Amino acid sequence: MKKKNIKNSMNNHTPMIKQYLSLKSQYPDMLLFYQMGDFYELFYEDAERISELLKITLTKKGYSNHKIIPMAGVPCHKSEYYLSKLVKLGESIAICDQQKETDCKKKLISRKVVRIITPGTVTDEVLLEENEDNFIAAIWKENNQFGYSVLDLSLGFFGVSKIFSSCDLLSEIERTNPKEILYPENFSDVFLIESRKCIRKRSLLEFDLETSYKLLNLQYNTCSLDGFGIEKNNFVIRAAGCLLQYVKSMNMTLLPNIRQLKYNYMEDSIFMNFSTRKSLEITQNISGEKKNTLSAILNKTVTSMGSRMLNRWLNSPLKNFKIVRNRHESVEALQFFYKELQFILRQVNDLERIYSRLALRTASPHDFVRMRSTLEILPNLHLILKKIKSKHIKKIRLSIGYFEEVLCLLKKAISLKPSKCIRDGGVIAELYNIELDELRSIKINSKEYIKNFEQKEKKKLMIESFKIKFNKIIGYYIQISKRHTHLIPKYYVIIQTLKNTERYSVPLLKEYEEKVLNSEMRSLLLEKKLYAEIFNIIEPFLEKLQNSALALSELDVLVNLSERAISLNYTRPIMSEKYGISLLESRHPVVECFLKTPFIKNSVFLSRTQRMIIITGPNMGGKSTYMRQIALIVIMAGIGSFVPARYALIGSIDKIFTRIGSADDLSNGYSTFMMEMMEISNILHNATSNSLVLIDELGRGTSTNEGLSLAWSCSRYLININKSMTLLSTHFVELTKLEEKEKFVKNFHFSAIKSDLHIAFLYKIKNGISKKSYGISVASLSGLPDSVLEDAEKKLIEIENT
């Protein structure tokens, strides 16, 4: 609720509403879940908003200050379900729980905010997407450069980058896909992020350099940031400091799970801008969905940790051939073992996120059960990994470890089927603590004691309707039919009269009740104490657990890539430091999986003497698919995957640029032509001789002569200035004359067979130029009226004969 909506005069409000408004004023930009018994209730604008977002009933909570109070609520026991929906919608929530009664007359219950949930700071399993990272980011801009920091609290990951342009920043935001973004109040490039769900303007004080420097050193117990490579990098220090401060305040605690700070050197991976990622459909298709993407085909990992890691790899293919070759060697070595390894890895739980909750001390009893079951399978995993002759797999195996001490503790300390929450008890296993077992035995034996007492009194008083019952309000009580009340002894104290029965209490029963309830309370307190001690015992192992989780993730990815290589008939690529790309009988990794007929394979050869390939041919003839498959194969090779080709040699690639029109987003008001020119300008300014450039139909959207002129001049610039490896498709036949004027250009085409107004595509690339574009024949496939097509044919003949 905004401040203007908080009433100026508090005197006309009920005590409860006064309390609510006071708490709400502390969290004006969040939905306040205000506990009222078994419900969380929301009032005023919060009620209206949650009603609209979740489609729940909007009602009223009487009147206050002479006005109706809009109200909506959700049951406490179902709150996680609603919170999950709100977080996905980009909402932040403050959870306000009841504490105790502070005013005996008015019975106003004390309440306080015990938990803050924002999209970028959640760690609860039910609020997280299983196969996605959950980053929160902060941006600082200075001198047209940016400091960019990301943190995933659920994994304990903290990273920073220095970014040199707004275009690169947009690319990095697309790559990391943060659920929440912090930016300073003077940020001039808000347009870059305003379309995202959860962006937060922060005070410049939160980006203060000195404060940020101190916060980072305090987090890592250091006196300098030299060890992280950012000592004099003020941009990233400001961004990281703001982010760390914000996450701490939202989490209401220290962040012991944040043990490292990774400096992301942009030059370590192949650069792909926003347009490239979108048009290649790596992890999201054009519609923003996950189906029919490279990830959908490659990602058959069996753990959520592995799934997240593979998507990270796909978004950051490496230029470091040593790491890539290690991965290729591992994928090859795993080919005889992937089935049995995947069988075991399916039993591995999300140790990466469990580690983080352990460090934050928010791990649930079920987290301990999942960790126990994961640690139990490690010996069998080691037995298989020891058979594999690979230095990299051996390194992974050693990082996985065994954790016998932790496993022994969890077997002894945690019940086989504990309750969901420690406050419900039943978490600590029997025989772990003698005192706890004794306290529990009182509760267990109470049923027998009550049964014996009931039978004894029933027999003594000869009352057939005599029963002993229990409820939370009055505790144990004796219930007797009214027709037998004349048989009741004087020491029976009546406590409740109902229609047909009366309820009584006796001193002996009350004393026993106190003993049982006291034992339950002591048992729960002891169980909580023992539970906290388990965290203390495990704490020294946390760093190794985190390393083990990362190693298990990588193993899952490599085993998955090995399975994909065999199942999809992929080939190990040769990675070369030399210039060029050579692919024989290559296939599109996504398209081939959805065809009912065999995919038509095509080759490509790019070298210093053949830097540009100009492709002509009909629409739908295979030009765009061909270009995309080359880029996707480069990406696959760069993450350590085998590739869909009979032979593949991949040279050193530093950047991939695409300009393919189907990825256009015209919502910002630019025309398709303007979008094309802006993207081409970006390519010409940033592509190098080691860049792969894919351009589809350059020069559309303006007159034929102007379009051809621009396509001609841009192509010559790419050939002679950028010297990039370029594939360019076109319908301008005149553009193919570049082959005669530039020695680095080669013409290729896709052909088709036409009969009457119908067309059959061959999808095979060949040397030379396509003599026709077959536009009218392709148009016939869209269902245009025959008369329109016939008229078009006549006009075409007329134009060609002019």
Curated annotation (Swiss-Prot):
UniProt-annotated binding residues for ATP: G617, P618, N619, M620, G621, G622, K623, S624
Protein keywords: ATP-binding, DNA damage, DNA repair, DNA-binding, Nucleotide-binding
UniProt GO BP: mismatch repair
GO cellular component terms, A-Z: cytosol
GO molecular function: ATP binding; ATP-dependent DNA damage sensor activity; damaged DNA binding; mismatched DNA binding
Domain of life: Bacteria
Function as written in the Swiss-Prot or TrEMBL entry: This protein is involved in the repair of mismatches in DNA. It is possible that it carries out the mismatch recognition step. This protein has a weak ATPase activity.
Family of this protein: Belongs to the DNA mismatch repair MutS family.
Database matches in HAMAP family: MutS
UniProt-recorded name of the protein: DNA mismatch repair protein MutS
Annotated source species: Buchnera aphidicola subsp. Acyrthosiphon pisum (strain APS) (Acyrthosiphon pisum symbiotic bacterium)
